[in-house]
């Protein structure tokens, strides 16, 4: 593998479009004259029995991993391996022990030292044969 292949294996870019049903996104690479990738799969927490689903929004800064290129696919054979925070979009939390998901509408799911907080901008729907609240 030559050095140009190594340089292109891990790239930082900005999500330019999203295909929700396919769980893929296209990424623009400003350092590559705004080259746009093919649709890249987004890594998830699970994809078989237990499935995770979280697709980055357009304009999210992401890290991409591209496969070595013996077949000539270039930057079309790869994955979005994650998003990251930067100065213009800081983390929503500052405590490293807190786990949370904050949504643009203000809704929140948060775990903090044994306490789970769920706040919804509209409504909360619970479906189960039995619901215990104590």
PLM segments and residue spans:
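Mixed-charge, glycine-accented linear interaction segment located at domain edges/termini
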Residues: 119-134
């Amino acid at each position: 593998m030559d050095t140009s292949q190594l340089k292109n294996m891990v790239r930082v870019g900005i999500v330019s479009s999203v295909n929700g049903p396919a769980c893929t996104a296209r990424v623009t690479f400003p350092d590559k004259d705004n080259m746009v990738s093919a649709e890249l799969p987004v890594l998830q927490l699970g994809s078989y029995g237990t499935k995770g689903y979280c697709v980055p929004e357009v304009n999210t800064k992401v890290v991409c991993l591209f496969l070595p290129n013996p077949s000539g696919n270039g930057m079309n054979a790869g994955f979005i391996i994650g998003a990251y925070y930067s100065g213009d979009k800081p983390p929503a939390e500052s405590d490293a022990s807190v786990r949370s998901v904050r949504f643009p509408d203000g809704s929140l799911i948060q775990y903090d030292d044994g306490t789970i907080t769920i706040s919804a901008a509209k409504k909360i729907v619970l479906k189960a044969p039995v619901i215990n609240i104590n």
